Curated annotation (Swiss-Prot):
Belongs to the methyltransferase superfamily. YrrT family. One of its GO terms (molecular function) is S-adenosylmethionine-dependent methyltransferase activity. Its EC number is 2.1.1.-. This is Uncharacterized methyltransferase BcerKBAB4_4222. The keyword Cell inner membrane does not apply. It comes from the Bacteria. Gene3D superfamilies: Vaccinia Virus protein VP39 (3.40.50.150).
Length: 212
């Protein structure tokens, strides 16, 4: 993952929170049960947490309130600025992304929401292999993101978006790297993880992978 999405992130920073609240009809279903999704990720995490894609700090805040020690990584300067306004003054956010980041001393859980799709499947594999080296046995990866059960589910979702006139959503689904569950299952298992997938709305699944 290079810097190709940073301009998009900076542009989206000031409207992101209205998106997650369902104010954009095209993305309302993508962010359905948003608070529950964040809570599920928090509940599945433990100990020292490395968070990729802090964004505007919504998940970060819940992790801190739950007593987790959080190391935040975010590539977008605008996102970091907004998050810092919402989070405790002493909390620092480091510039970086899923593949290039400063490694904390000790990590128990790696988390992310609505972001892993910025990586190609090959990059996802590289990232998970890297995380496998960072985590001890029992360590976890908990990612919530739009993924699809199979190719048919993806095709039907894209077609439904087009039929409803949701052309921005359809374009998003076709240009970003939304993957399939069998692909992610293979990536996790090949890198020493046991993984489960839990669907929380039509688009978003929570991937909970435990290092074996």
């Amino acid at each position: 993952m290079g810097t190709e999405f940073n301009g998009l992130f900076d542009e989206w920073a000031h409207t992101y929170d209205s998106f997650v609240q369902g104010e954009d009809i095209q993305y309302k279903e993508v962010f359905a049960h948003y608070e529950d999704i964040l809570e599920d990720v928090v509940n599945k995490s433990f100990g020292n947490v490395l968070e990729f894609g802090v964004g505007t700090g919504n998940l970060t805040n819940k992790l801190l309130l739950a007593g987790r020690t959080v190391y935040g990584i975010e590539p977008s300067r605008e996102m970091r600025t907004i998050a810092k306004e919402k989070l405790p003054k002493e909390f620092s956010i480091t510039e970086g992304d899923f593949l290039s980041f400063e490694v904390p001393n000790s990590i128990d859980t790696i988390v992310s929401t609505y972001a892993f799709h910025h990586l190609t499947d090959d990059e996802k594999d590289v990232a998970i292999a890297k995380y496998s080296q960072l985590l001890n046995k029992g360590g976890k990866i908990v990612f919530a993101d739009t993924i699809f059960a199979d190719q048919d589910a993806y095709d039907k979702t894209v077609e439904a978006a087009k039929q409803r006139g949701f052309h921005q959503l359809a374009n998003d689904l076709q240009t970003e790297y939304y993957t399939r569950i069998p692909i992610m299952q293979s990536i996790f298992e090949n890198n020493g993880f046991h993984v489960t997938f839990t669907r929380l709305n039509h688009f978003v699944w929570v991937m909970e992978a435990t290092k074996q």
